[in-house]
Amino acid sequence: MTTDTIVAQATAPGRGGVGIIRISGDKATDVAMAVLGHLPKPRYADYCDFKNASGQVIDQGIALFFKGPNSFTGEDVLELQGHGGQIVLDMLIKRVLEVEGIRIAKPGEFSEQAFMNDKLDLTQAEAIADLIDATSEQAAKSALQSLQGEFSKEVHELVDQVTHLRLYVEAAIDFPDEEVDFLSDGKIANALYKIIDKLSAVQASAKQGSIIREGMKVVIAGRPNAGKSSLLNALAGKESAIVTEIAGTTRDVLREHIHLDGMPLHIIDTAGLRDTTDTVEQIGIERAWNEINSADRVLFMVDGTTTDAVDPHDIWPDFINRLPANLGVTVVRNKADLTGENLAMTEEKGYSVYRISAKTGLGVEELKQHLKSLMGYKSNLEGGFIARRRHLEALDVAASHLQLGKEQLEIYLAGELLAEELRMAQLALSEITGRFTSDDLLGKIFSSFCIGK
């Protein structure tokens, strides 16, 4: 861990009402004496002059001193809050750098110091960046939940439960009770099942939190002239795609990024899927399948005037059979204004079926509500946390090891192998909060922060 004293502008570059310079480290007191002529009383606002080396006043403003470890970084911290002109702030930083042992902070280094000094865990540190980068009110609320430790609490509880069970298994192996077969008495199995259930619940919440942060990717797919581009326009609320009666008008991927009541949604319109000898259209269809394979959800667009079927396996079995196994599909029967179909949503063999008219807007609002529900709109209003892709990956790894441990217990009664799977699950979960995390990962995470944070 670095012992350098660092300085950076904590407010956005440019012109503003207030500009803040932040200093953290052992030399913060030296900076105070050099620039202010005195050390402010800790945690009190001190209005004073900010002076250069010749004693001339650079600016006037508020100085705040926080004595470590009772500060954001856990070190001595000095904040100089002056006027928000960039020239003035640059002069002030230049003056601070004249004090021996001070350097410019790297992106995210203040938060990194807070993490290294146990003021924050890694999920809380990441939540700071997510709160700053939030693109919707819901994302900001969820990031704040993570910053306040909601996600960390869930992960710590899982780590504690896995660790406790692992220690119990290892102790039972080392000190066996000859009268009781601890692997088959049900206690370990019950404890393991409870952990797996809790992890599954956390995974579901984290997936919703990831959607809040990164958005849900929804691909509109189907045969040519089914109304895919019209639906894109209806969902986006503007004419993003060209719509004609000519089949195959859309030949490339079109993207729109919208928010549904604060929930980010990435809508992808694709070329109509069919056999064709047209080289350009073939490229568009190949790109369409690439988008489908990486989607969170597919809206299977069906021209309602061509078939009465509602089961996608009856409508186009080859298309459904080619989709990734775990990809969710919503069937959208279009042109209800022509077919006269009831707009009510129905469930058909596990698939949600919506009847709409993308041209007139009939049923589109109900489809939007469906997409909001898929993104966990209600649960996130009630207070969900935000999550990143690396969190989901770590949870998946932990779940995989717990399932392998379950097999070792149920099939082979292999205590040593169960203990090893529990250890691996513990390590995967601990990576989320940063207890066991490589320096490379830490560098990647904090380098994405803004300077001064």
Curated annotation (Swiss-Prot):
GO MF terms listed in the record are: GTP binding; GTPase activity; metal ion binding
Q: Which UniProt keywords apply?
A: Cytoplasm, GTP-binding, Hydrolase, Magnesium, Metal-binding, Nucleotide-binding, Potassium, tRNA processing
Per the annotation, which location comes first and is thus the protein's main one?
cytoplasm
Name of this chain's protein: tRNA modification GTPase MnmE
Domain TrmE-type G: from-to ranges: 215-376
Localization per Swiss-Prot or TrEMBL = Cytoplasm
Residues the record lists as binding K(+): 225, 244, 246, 249
